[in-house]
Amino acid sequence: MADLFERAAKFYAELQSELCRVLADADGGSEFTSDAWQRPGGGGGVARVLEGGALFEKAGVNWSSVDGELPAEIAEHMPGQGRSFRACGISLVLHPRSPMVPTTHANFRCLTKGDALWFGGGADLTPYYLFRDDAVHFHQTLATVCDRHAPIGDYDRFKAWCDEYFFLPHRGETRGVGGIFFDYLGAKGTPHPPEQMFDFVQDLGKAFVPAYLPIAQRRSTETYGDLERTWQLRRRGRYVEFNLIYDRGTLFGLKTNGRVESILMSLPPLVRWDYDVMATPGSREAELISHLRPTDWLQRAG
């Protein structure tokens, strides 16, 4: 188990380097900074952030491998004995400059506690304007990986999990058009072979670029004006609301004395809240809102 954890940590670190290389090249206007840090309780990580780019207004790709003692109220809800834990993973959020390019998030992680080891992760897409082809492409790329690793990769289940997880109850809408989400893979009734789980997670990590980058490059040439930019900033407000109120990773990090700068890296650089603003009926903004609910983008149901 210890060997698999170390291999996972190494893979996530290598994936961080590769993603930053590819994303900086795609941006063409800025580079990622690198900030290595140590956690007082044990372990550390590397935060890599690109700001003020041509394609990305802000992009962050974090890697960490930490260990320590969990608070009792968290430990009792997790698999394994005791309160000692180890966690490694990669987390990324890309906030594009153009409102025609969707924001995206992905993370892949491995945790151990007592005799339990499990994987978690996923990837999701948050557009500001709806392009159906983009949603289909993103979902199809992830579904192909899941199908290749069935039954461990269960696209239909992970997609439904994503729709449920990335939901803002106080707004009555999903954060975006979804993707996949999974947790406790290898624990809580999913006793899959560890090596096969790791193969699946590695394949997913490598699929992120082909799932997202063609969308970003295609939409970056779309024209937009002040109306679209204002809409983007308002919709970013929903992103902030979810991350600070509901996101499990954010709350876990804050409750385990995590590094605040890394935890809040996911927040966009600019955002706005305007009082009681509604999308105009029949507008492209209204079209997006109408699709912020579980949608069978690949028409696999039935």
Task: Label each residue range with its predicted role.
Residues A47-G121:
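Internal mixed beta-strand/loop scaffold within catalytic domains of large alpha/beta enzymes
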Residues D163-F181, Q217-S262:
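An amphipathic alpha-helical core segment
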Residues A2-P79, K188-G225, R229-Y239:
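Gly/Pro-rich turn-and-neighbor structural signature
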Residues V145-F200, P214-Q217:
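Long, charged, mostly alpha-helical binding arms that flank functional sites
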Residues G114-F158:
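Compact, glycine/acidic-enriched structural inserts
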Residues T256-G302:
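TerminUS-proximal long segments
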Residues I74-E76, D134, P191-H192, L251-N257, ...:
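Short conserved micro-motifs at the rims of enzyme active sites and ligand-binding pockets
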Residues A59-G60, R86-C88, L117-T126, E173-Q196, ...:
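Glycine-rich, often proline-containing surface loops adjacent to acidic residues and nearby aromatics
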